[in-house]
């Protein structure tokens, strides 16, 4: 869901950079030594998943995995996503360096929101936890789409048509991400339940 370089206004870019700085600072403060491998693995997964993208106007449609990252990382999703986006901008010119802050916020902020919204349900057993895991994947993409839409509309009314295309293009991705998040949640619950217990204690 990268916003291409040269699209957003300076005010939106500055605001995104400021919010990203705050989010990354909080994420680094909450990052403990034991969580570093988990953060690194999910950052790498995000990097690979979002490389396969389809251009939709000024935005690329692709898997984001931010619902999953929110489920497993919380605030540390901010530095994880920032590192992946920085490498993509540097190596492949995806999103560009000037839009790094906005792109980080549009993908990491929903991850944090998902973490706090669903963690009380993810602690439970049975169907409710599974529904929450699926909803976490869907919500991450939905909120990212809305934030991208807000950034584009704030920049100019000319992007309204592009906003509609972006939101429509991400509907199937929402379902895919919900299924992926649910599958990984159930896998961890069965194979490594202590990981989830440590996150949601």
What does each of the following model-derived ranges do?
Residues 1-68:
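Hydrophobic transmembrane alpha-helices
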Residues 11-14, 36-41, 78-82, 100-105, ...:
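Hydrophobic alpha-helical transmembrane segments
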